[in-house]
């Protein structure tokens, strides 16, 4: 018999991960809710491919030009004569917004140039053409 020493099993230390998992899930929900998603124009457009396409960081206004040369701004069809007035109206809300033109690969170049001229006339500072990487 030993005196003074106890021979008992030592309990293993356990780390409670419940609070850490709660924080991780809250952060995940926060990032999902606050992340910004890229808006599309709402019209099916077959974009041409480009070997040196660069992604646009921020886009405010989307203009889609279909193969039938119909022009859509924010999912509404607009006549080519009304493009500048529509863009001027949209620039009142977002004065520094950039413009992304999503032209179908079969759309006429003249229609794209008319939209670009109207955008410059409306005061758009940044214009980008949407393309897909091959």
UniProtKB/Swiss-Prot annotation:
<keyword id="KW-0472">Membrane</keyword>
<keyword id="KW-1133">Transmembrane helix</keyword>
<feature type="transmembrane region" description="Helical">
    <location>
        <begin position="18"/>
        <end position="38"/>
    </location>
</feature>
<comment type="similarity">
    <text>Belongs to the ExbD/TolR family.</text>
</comment>
<dbReference type="GO" id="GO:0015031">
    <property type="term" value="P:protein transport"/>
</dbReference>
<keyword id="KW-0813">Transport</keyword>
<comment type="subunit">
    <text>The accessory proteins ExbB and ExbD seem to form a complex with TonB.</text>
</comment>
<dbReference type="Pfam" id="PF02472">
    <property type="entry name" value="ExbD"/>
</dbReference>
<comment type="function">
    <text>Involved in the TonB-dependent energy-dependent transport of various receptor-bound substrates.</text>
</comment>
<protein>
    <recommendedName>
        <fullName>Biopolymer transport protein exbD2</fullName>
    </recommendedName>
</protein>
<dbReference type="InterPro" id="IPR003400">
    <property type="entry name" value="ExbD"/>
</dbReference>
<keyword id="KW-1003">Cell membrane</keyword>
<feature type="topological domain" description="Periplasmic">
    <location>
        <begin position="39"/>
        <end position="134"/>
    </location>
</feature>
<keyword id="KW-0997">Cell inner membrane</keyword>
<dbReference type="GO" id="GO:0005886">
    <property type="term" value="C:plasma membrane"/>
</dbReference>
<dbReference type="GO" id="GO:0022857">
    <property type="term" value="F:transmembrane transporter activity"/>
</dbReference>
<keyword id="KW-0653">Protein transport</keyword>
<keyword id="KW-0812">Transmembrane</keyword>
<feature type="topological domain" description="Cytoplasmic">
    <location>
        <begin position="1"/>
        <end position="17"/>
    </location>
</feature>
């Amino acid at each position: 018999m030993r005196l003074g020493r106890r021979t008992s099993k030592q309990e293993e230390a356990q780390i409670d991960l419940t609070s850490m998992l709660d924080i991780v899930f809250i952060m995940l929900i926060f990032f999902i809710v606050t992340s910004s998603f890229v808006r599309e124009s709402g019209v099916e457009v077959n974009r041409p491919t480009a070997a040196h396409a660069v992604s646009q960081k921020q886009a405010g206004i989307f203009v889609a030009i279909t193969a039938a040369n119909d022009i859509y701004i924010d999912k509404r069809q607009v006549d080519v004569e009304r493009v500048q007035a529509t863009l001027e109206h949209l620039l009142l809300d977002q004065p520094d917004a950039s413009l992304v033109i999503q032209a179908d690969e079969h759309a006429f170049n003249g229609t794209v140039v008319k939209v670009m001229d109207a955008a410059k006339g409306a005061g758009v500072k940044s214009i980008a053409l949407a393309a897909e990487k091959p």
